[in-house]
C-alpha cells in the first residue's frame, strides 16, 4: 500500500498542534476489515518519511492475533515529525532513515529494522 491506514504523523491527517487528527487515511483504513477477515500478519506502506509499527490490531483495537501495520517510509527524502500526543495503536516510532529485513524460516518470521548505520531499531519474531 502507499497511504497510511494508521499514522502518528503530526500534520498529514490533521494538524495535531491545532486540531484533532484522523491518525491515518480513513478510506484506506476501511480495507483493514479484509485484513482482519483473512488474518493478514503485516501490512506495509510508505508515503510518510519515517518508521512506525503498530501493536497488532483487529477491529480497530489491540488484539494479539491482529495485524501489524508498518510505515516504512524512511528510505530517503525529508523526514516527518510525529504528533506530540500518544495514540492507542503505535508500538514503535523512529524518525530516521532506515530499511527493513525480513527472514522466514519454517514457521518463524524474523523482522528487523535498521538505521543507515546498521544499528538495530526494531525487532519482532512471529511464530505461526
Tell me the role of every PLM-derived stretch.
Residues 4, 41, 48-51, 75-76:
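Catalytic metal-binding/acid-base residues of hydrolase active sites
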Residues 5, 16, 24, 46, ...:
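Non-transmembrane, interaction-prone segments in cytosolic or luminal domains
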Residues 2, 8, 47, 69, ...:
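Divalent metal-coordination and catalytic microenvironments
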Residues 29, 33, 48, 96-97, ...:
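A structural signal for well-ordered alpha-helical segments within the folded catalytic domains
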